[in-house]
Amino acid sequence: MNTFGNIFKLTSFGESHGTAIGGVIDGCPAGIVLDMEFVQGELDKRRPGQSELTTSRNESDKVEFLSGIYEGKTIGTPIGFIVWNNNQHSSDYDSLKNVFRPSHADYTYFQKYRHYDHRGGGRSSARETIARVVAGAIAKLILQKKGIKITAYVSQVGDICLSKSYIQVDFSNIEKTAVRCPDLEIAKQMIALIQSVRLRGDTVGGVITCICHGVPVGLGNPVFGKLSAALSNAMMSINATKGFDYGMGFNGIHRKGSEANDLYYRNKDGKIVTKSNYSGGIQGGISSGEDIYFRVAFKPVATLLQGQLTVDKDGNEIQLEVKGRHDPCVLPRAVPIVESMAAMTILDYYLYNY
Amino acid sequence: MNTFGNIFKLTSFGESHGTAIGGVIDGCPAGIVLDMEFVQGELDKRRPGQSELTTSRNESDKVEFLSGIYEGKTIGTPIGFIVWNNNQHSSDYDSLKNVFRPSHADYTYFQKYRHYDHRGGGRSSARETIARVVAGAIAKLILQKKGIKITAYVSQVGDICLSKSYIQVDFSNIEKTAVRCPDLEIAKQMIALIQSVRLRGDTVGGVITCICHGVPVGLGNPVFGKLSAALSNAMMSINATKGFDYGMGFNGIHRKGSEANDLYYRNKDGKIVTKSNYSGGIQGGISSGEDIYFRVAFKPVATLLQGQLTVDKDGNEIQLEVKGRHDPCVLPRAVPIVESMAAMTILDYYLYNY
Amino acid sequence: MNTFGNIFKLTSFGESHGTAIGGVIDGCPAGIVLDMEFVQGELDKRRPGQSELTTSRNESDKVEFLSGIYEGKTIGTPIGFIVWNNNQHSSDYDSLKNVFRPSHADYTYFQKYRHYDHRGGGRSSARETIARVVAGAIAKLILQKKGIKITAYVSQVGDICLSKSYIQVDFSNIEKTAVRCPDLEIAKQMIALIQSVRLRGDTVGGVITCICHGVPVGLGNPVFGKLSAALSNAMMSINATKGFDYGMGFNGIHRKGSEANDLYYRNKDGKIVTKSNYSGGIQGGISSGEDIYFRVAFKPVATLLQGQLTVDKDGNEIQLEVKGRHDPCVLPRAVPIVESMAAMTILDYYLYNY
Amino acid sequence: MNTFGNIFKLTSFGESHGTAIGGVIDGCPAGIVLDMEFVQGELDKRRPGQSELTTSRNESDKVEFLSGIYEGKTIGTPIGFIVWNNNQHSSDYDSLKNVFRPSHADYTYFQKYRHYDHRGGGRSSARETIARVVAGAIAKLILQKKGIKITAYVSQVGDICLSKSYIQVDFSNIEKTAVRCPDLEIAKQMIALIQSVRLRGDTVGGVITCICHGVPVGLGNPVFGKLSAALSNAMMSINATKGFDYGMGFNGIHRKGSEANDLYYRNKDGKIVTKSNYSGGIQGGISSGEDIYFRVAFKPVATLLQGQLTVDKDGNEIQLEVKGRHDPCVLPRAVPIVESMAAMTILDYYLYNY
């Protein structure tokens, strides 16, 4: 399905080689000043070809708002927006018309849809994320007014891992390198790895860490409305994701309960807080007021510039050589998408309560 | 919220110390023979006190169906069912009336609900899973008829890890030990660890692995209806979960793309299959026909039989001693819950297509 | 489907000849005092056999709450409730096992469900309304605290019509007669008509009028979330309904626009109000603060104590004689159901805003 | 809210004086040939200024598809479409910036939205129906392939009423006059009435009748998923509607049950059919296979070219004179909208079953 959210809802449309990508945001509160520069800036962050690490596609996507805004503010009606598709090299994909690319969605799509658009991955392509980032930017603007800040960064590429806690990391460094890792030493190593992988025509995966700061207590519902489940659903809807964990996550299994509890105490201001935050800001599915932090694992992207053996629709084996422009590592580009999905999810739950 | 699913929908109700736990299943196809023994058997699997590993609560929950069934078959109308609450020791919890148990949902619930039921964790308690297991059992019955089999087992407890691929594991061993690990050697080590942790009044977490075999190709939708996102949402809705990954998951980050692609070929029967299954049976959010396998991480349970420092509603520090009956490790009991959530999710997507 | 509402949600279950009828209410705010007498009283109002007009079924339905309530107040968790089925004469229906009753749902159900429960109409029976009335009673309690009052009454039976505006009617008279018409003269005529129809073994239909007083301005959304559409959907979900209109409705067609506009003016208290209320309290799909009033048309009930020619499942013509206990006119019994559906709808929209 | 449907879903956006009107259709099956001429033709039918009866606004709306279509067929992905707004006279509305037009949505909108777009009624304007008609056209194309035909016509204007049953009416006459009434004699009278009303600067309402032919048995669900409830919800979502009834509707109250039952018999082909169709093709909320027929009542449009007394935002009384271009009767233009809503509803339920 193509709609995300319950109250703040994004319905997206558009194939990467169709006429336009776009979306409709329903449930956006009225009276929000729309900072167009900020929205366009977020969209620019996701573009490939913005650094030496990524491909040269150099898409300059300008978002156009068609409704829902009057005199610079939202009016509470659905916000329709589009980004025209240009600069898409359809011919790069012509050799792929009848071929199933390994680990791509082609085979599953063919089985499902029969008549489908083979060009550029149709709706499984990363260009579909444009709509997410536009809606996410608007969500961020609204959350910022409530003192809620969403920050994501690359914390692992292949075997290169930033193992420090987010508390010890300087967020202002994130945008200083193309790889969006806030530890400049580790960032260098990551860049070197990506370059070498690229030269070999291979790809590499990694992990993005995200922190949601200032989320008030009480968002989420026990049982089936857990905020942790909603965040995992949001992250796992991003292309190329393979895993999600929050708080101590998969690594926390090595701790005993006595080593992993967040003990309550009353602080200097008389407020009830916890000494630690192993839970990652969510207890029993409901936000606790502490920082929410989680990780998203991304697989190595499946388009290789190496040759690969595969089959076409009739089952004949063929050697696949893909020309064109592809990424050795999607992690840096995925950072704004993770932030967008987090912003939309948090806002959706926020509006449910307030 | 308290409803799970889009077509095969479970709405659950009931607090652990209220009158009854129950649910309503809507969207169950008509004409399914309801194997009552099987359903009751699944419910028995989740019971504590069934082995030396778990607590002595010894709840014998008998499910009672109130509607939706006629002459032993489903009739397509909503299936209402209840399990009466007995054998709940309310007095065990009386010392907790005004106290926030560390890493429990108490504090977040108090902030959210004001007037809430402190006894036994209300709806955040594991007893709420009764409804999930009943609905999951019915879902399994329906899937079995379509040749779809769901199997889960404990693959990690603390540092003890069953690292073999599921392909090399013998499922018939799962129920042979209390810890539900199919490798009997590893199972022994797990049991020893749990016993020692229990004696110290501490708790330990772990990982459950789940395989969905025989899922046809085409379930799921790209963008926001990905089957991977739905499964993660379902698993993360279970109490005490901290993470989800599928296919090569978090561990796959160490592979390059060239080492992680599932290459297509035509097999002896002329069918198009893959040589490997790093994707875990889901490509681009849609099932590929291969086995779907995923992991769910559980944190160490938060109720300790050790004393702990905490605060009460007025912020006064108090020493918490919890009497009663608690689990050092919830993993074995969570296995039928993971299977239930998987069955309901797969069935929901199955009914969407067929 | 078996769920009604978006925020205040009722999921109902139960066949009239099954074990129990019941429901789960999700989204009920916490802290509401549950006036059990009031709820049981509303349920008693819908019972047949409470007057000389209706049949002698004499069902005494006692509602039992299973969850969601602690120390007499709602706790914000789902409220599960049941009413056990007794006093249902299954044998009255044995002659109907393979026969399609004219204008009943039998034929359509058979075509749809294959294996279905023929006894007493299964889920198409009026007993399914028990769940609606319980949830409606709770909704009324919540609305009353906000100064919102829902009142319905019978305004037409066959050709006997109460044509006065609701403004000129005395609501305290509604419960004074079995027919629930607030004009005692007209009520007498209605009763006489129903008696004569009953003696002939025939049935008659009518109209119920409903007023929602004190609904604040702003409930509803333009386009697809119109409060008028929601109310019509709610009313048309009641068995035997054939039509809905509000404000001047179908009769207003005879007016010109100049005769039908509600002109604004500022009243003595300085508040902006309208001189008239042809719109029926809803403008552009949003409540205006004025009384919402609407009508629901009910067809004559389809079970006749006269013989009727029909066919069985094999298409053979047979003469249908129905024994048992049936109503010549369902209008009086439908009054609490109309109020319940109105209360649930208004509350659902109220909670969306506040 | 701005989304209609459960499976075949339309999300619409756009204010009449904004940049564009548009929508996204999700859930459209793949492989449907999109007859662009037919879609544009349906859109042309709703335009004002196409006859001497309506206003001279002369909007020529051309729909543009942005996604979801490849080589002329739908591909199963969301279909995004827009219609650019031009030819909207903003200045006609400048006198209205702070004034509440009687029986318009202005007052309720102001109360609800604070900051809203006063020009042309924003989203409460009839231009929003563009999206409905585009989606409805596509729905009709799909239904036609299944042998399902939707036909609507004007059956009443003011006191002029076409009282014949739809069975005796010649549908080929509908488009022969501007008023879209299939009885040419009655049509003349209706046109005369509308002209005279227009000269007086007044407005008049009426009724549209709609027939859905060829709907298979089994669409709809008892309880809350009744097809009759869904149709009423769809119709009542149209601007200016005041009532809905189907089958014998409000007029059927005058019949006794014995005079209103549809008796079953086996016809020459051995098929089980009914002798009559008082039920209007829906029994117990489920389609019976017979023609579904219903009526929708429209109030006289609220914009008058006569002066009217009203208040502005500060409560000061002012005399309202509206310049511009307005309709004395919206009924003819509403015919394609009624058909669109019926088509979308029937298709939604059809896809649920098949």
Swiss-Prot record, chains A, B, C, D:
Alphabetized InterPro entries for the sequence: Chorismate_synth, Chorismate_synth_AroC_sf, Chorismate_synthase_CS
Residues where NADP(+) binds: R46
One family name in Pfam for this protein: Chorismate_synt
Protein name: Chorismate synthase
Binding positions (FMN): R123, S124, S125, N239, A240, G284, K299, P300, V301, A302, T303, R325
Keyword Metal-binding: no
Keyword Magnesium belongs to the record: no
Cellular compartments per GO CC: cytosol
One GO term of the biological process aspect: amino acid biosynthetic process
Listed CDD domains: Chorismate_synthase
